[in-house]
Amino acid sequence: MYEATDHGHGQLCIAATARYVPQTRVRPEVLVREPAATPTSVREAVMQSVYADTLRWRRQATAPVTVDHPSGRATMPARVTSESRLTLSEMASAVAREAVRRCHPNDNRAPDQIIVCANSFEDDLSLSCAGRLHSELGSPGVPFAIGQLQGVSFFLALQVAADMMASDERMHAALIVAAERWLPPFSRQTGTLTALGDGAAAVLVRRHAGPGWHVRSVTVCTPSSAVSIAPHETFVDEAAVVEVIGKTCAQAGLKPAALDWIVPPRINAALACEVSAQARLPAGRMWYPDPGDIGYLCAADAPAQLDLLSQSVAPADGQRILMWSAGFQGQAACAILEFRGS
């Protein structure tokens, strides 16, 4: 198992956030656009071939598995967000620019590093979202992306940004951008666990930025590559999540009662309640907007929730947020943020 922890006690500060959630809603089982029966170009033919190979590998790797986890017995959202106009990288670009603008209203300085989080494919496989943002914003750092960790992606990006700033005193700002757009032939449904929506969010973090949400502790755990998990086995490892939450609180030197907001992933409400109970988190402090009208934004979920929460509350000095998330094959992550007014 891989485990990464940062407990720099506020070395990293959330300087600005932004989110984009499409207005259009669709039923999760409906494919918005069917792939063309006959490819209209060589590029489209290559893309369809890659998609077909990916799906064929999943079918051949194992037979479908019914997983008896409490998290897998959820009420599915009736409708989810669907973006029909913007591509994945266009959504990412929009929230990235907005986060930079909010941090520097009169200054267009590029962040030192850009980290992109996504699990869905770009509309055109020849394009790179990370490369596009690097070019558009003029970041001096090497572009890179984190994928296939679902909701844990943002937390790993936060950890990476903290590690980079700790090892390079010339680095002062990093932009984390997460975006998802689910296109055929891939389904929006992850078994009976949840349904996936489209959307994007960005978080700009800085070193010692003054007032704002400071990162107290981050913990990320992923299963060892030696652990065999079938591709069809979609579940949340609740025990791993509870353990990660406990470690994060211990490393920050905090008891659950000292937390003011608990922000779980919007995978499903049953999972959120079950994990909170097992981790002995104060139930009355859970911040869980109804996911029924947007679905689960996957990699973009945590940063989108952070933006929504920061726009919805007026925190006092010393108040804290605990955010946790999970991947669909055993990954788990948690972070604690503390507000400092001066």
Residue ranges and their predicted role:
Residues 1-86, 188-247, 329, 336-342:
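Condensing-enzyme catalytic core mediating Claisen C-C bond formation in acyl metabolism
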Residues 124-138, 172-181, 214-217, 272-283:
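Acidic-glycine-rich active-site phosphate/pyrophosphate-binding loop
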Residues 8-11, 109-113, 140-142, 168-174, ...:
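Short coil/turn connectors at secondary-structure junctions
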Residues 183-186:
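Short, solvent-exposed loop/turn segments at secondary-structure junctions
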Residues 79-148, 254-272:
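Conserved beta-ketoacyl condensing-enzyme motif
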Residues 87-104, 236-252, 305-309:
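Short, well-ordered amphipathic alpha-helical segments that serve as non-catalytic structural scaffolds
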Residues 121-122, 126, 140-142, 148-166, ...:
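Claisen-condensing/thiolase-fold acyl-transfer catalytic domains that form or cleave C-C bonds
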Residues 15, 117, 174-180, 205, ...:
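Short beta-strand segments
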